[in-house]
Design a protein with these regions (language model features):
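N-terminal chloroplast transit peptides
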Residues: 2-46
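NTP/phosphate- and nucleic-acid-binding module
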Residues: 37-565
């Protein structure tokens, strides 16, 4: 994404502010149903934890996130044994479940619970004229530069340069330049300082202090400046002039190898919706206003994929194109409704931390040429504040383009109420699944102290947690305990919950394993369960508090906690 200098500095400054927020402890009592009783802390071994968690820590750095994801089977680098390509990732057992849950909640919120939105699953490869009409074939590109010495490539709008000026120089003479990749403020300043030290040494000015850096995008450099700006890799002015690089992956359809067989992997899912507008309208008996929702894979040949799954070359999108009548008095109301619905989904349905979210309203030159308005949902990741989701008022650009490109009356709609014919406008809430997953993991990552020991855990909303509960027999060598635990485990599976059975090790150690992968509830079968018919204990992951419930009440209890009913 391209930022103006002003916007960049706001982002960089905002990073430290956002990181200063500490997680609130979030401790909450587990509401007991009729027949439940709160355990004393000394009742059994599994209740020996302190029930009040220490304050949670700030969001971790990316190394911690990446390490956790690989260690616990959330995300792996793709084809790692062959040193696979950058920008491609495989989702492990927990990652696949988390991703599925996010998509299910999104679909339920934006499609199933609405009468005016229907679904679509279009193909990944369209006729290439689709991309000609949409503008992707000619304009879907990023500016790219090469380092002639190291052969490394960069997105020009992700490189920032600053003049180097000695402190105390009243004439503000520029002794050289530094050039660094986009990152958070600490990373950029650190890289610039390293480069400036080499510059001072080369100029025989070692020991001199320099003024604060004033970063600007490389694409804003004058010809005179560009000739002196060093490559981040070589430290010398070895960068090529920026040139456009089309981001679409090219492939071929059929056995022949010629230009007529060239096709492209879709760079977005939206165009599949637009070219099917008439098909869906005629077959679903919908009337304007109505929406078409789709989620699926998209591909962009990013010049420099970075920041883990935030910017990758293969990713998934979830989008709605909501078609409305034209008119400047119409779209603002619908636009705001979709903003409100998106916030409800992100905060209430999946549990993103609201203190790490922001709303960026685009105006004037910040809008795409076809857009009437656009509001981006931003999120403060460990590497900075970035766009998470966009809600755009797109006008009728896409339907008009495909009507003209195909020569068919694709977009015209006859409104029976107003007796008018028009090409509908649309509101587009668009969200990347992979970016959302990263935001969810960053929101959920927590550290506290329980029983005098540090605890790392993922505070997933139970609705999206990959594993909903873990069933624990107190001892694995007691057949009576194991029999009851296995029976409960199988009943929970039959109910449709993804649950885990764990009998290995001390109960406290099993709790820690469950906490680290975000399992909201731990259900322990102990001797009171089998000897006194006293039910099981259910431990809440976040507060570590425990209650005892009759076995027959476990499924209704979990249903209320997970599903809300």
């Amino acid at each position: 994404m391209k930022f103006s200098t002003t916007t960049l500095m706001m982002i960089l400054c905002g990073q430290n502010v956002a990181r200063a927020f500490a997680f609130s402890s979030g401790s909450r009592s587990v509401a007991a149903r009729s027949g439940a009783r709160v355990l004393s802390s000394a009742a059994t071994e599994e209740a020996a934890e302190a029930t009040t968690a220490a304050p949670l820590q700030e969001i971790p750095d990316m190394e911690e996130i990446v390490s956790l994801c690989k260690r616990r089977g959330i995300i792996f680098p793709s084809s790692e044994i062959y040193n696979g390509y950058a920008g491609f990732f495989d989702y492990g057992p927990l990652g696949a479940e988390l991703k599925k849950n996010l998509k299910d909640v999104w679909w339920n919120h934006f499609v199933t619970q609405r009468e005016d939105v229907v679904g679509l699953d279009s193909s990944i490869i369209h006729n290439p004229t689709t991309w000609k009409s949409s503008g992707h074939l000619d304009g879907f590109s990023d500016p790219m530069v090469d380092c002639k010495e190291t052969k490394l490539r960069y997105r020009a709008d992700q490189l920032f340069f600053s003049p180097v000026i000695l402190q105390g120089d009243e004439d503000k003479n520029i002794i050289g330049y530094v050039c660094v990749q986009e990152g958070n403020d600490d990373e950029m300043v650190k890289a610039a300082k390293t480069m400036s030290k080499k510059l001072l040494k080369e100029k025989d000015l070692k020991g001199n202090r320099i003024e604060a850096f004033s970063f600007k995008e490389l694409v804003e450099a004058t010809e005179e400046e560009f000739a002196q700006i060093p490559s981040p890799a070589s430290g010398k002015p070895t960068l090529t002039q920026p040139r456009d690089f089309n981001l679409m992956f090219e492939t071929r359809v059929g056995a022949a190898v010629d230009s007529e067989n060239i096709a492209y992997l879709r760079p977005e899912t939206a165009q599949g919706i637009f070219i099917n507008f008439k098909n869906v309208l005629n077959s679903s008996r919908q009337k304007i206003p109505f929406g078409i929702a789709q989620m699926g894979k998209a591909f962009r040949n990013e010049i420099t994929p970075r920041n883990f799954i935030f910017r990758s070359r293969e990713f998934e999108q979830m989008e709605v194109e909501y078609f409305i009548p034209p008119g400047d008095d119409v779209w603002p109301e619908y636009h705001q409704k979709w903003i409100d619905s998106s916030k409800d989904f992100l905060v209430d349905k999946i549990g993103l931390r609201e203190d790490l979210m922001g709303w960026d309203v685009h105006e004037g030159d910040g809008l795409a040429h076809y857009a009437r308005a656009c509001t981006d949902v931003t999120f403060t990741f460990p590497f900075g504040t970035q766009e998470l989701m966009g809600i755009a008022a797109r006008g009728n650009y896409d339907l008009t383009q495909h009507t003209e490109g195909s020569g068919k009356n694709l977009g015209e709609y006859y409104d029976e109420e107003t007796k008018e014919r028009y090409i509908p406008h649309c509101i587009e809430p668009s969200l990347g699944v992979d970016r959302l997953m990263l935001a969810v993991i960053c929101s959920a990552y927590a550290e506290d102290e329980v029983g005098g020991e540090k605890r790392n855990f993922l505070k997933f909303n139970p609705r999206i947690a990959p594993i909903k509960a873990v069933v624990l027999p107190l001892l694995k060598n007691k057949p009576a305990l194991v029999e009851v635990a296995r029976d409960l485990f199988e009943k929970l599976q039959a109910r449709g919950y993804n649950v885990m059975y764990d009998a290995a090790g001390a109960v406290g150690r099993r709790y820690r394993r469950a906490d680290e992968v975000g399992i909201p509830f731990a259900i322990t079968v102990d001797f009171e369960t089998i000897e006194d018919d006293a039910g099981v204990t259910i431990r809440d992951r976040d507060s570590t508090e425990q209650i005892r419930l009759p076995i027959d009440d476990v499924i209704p209890y979990l249903s209320k906690k997970i599903d809300g009913y």
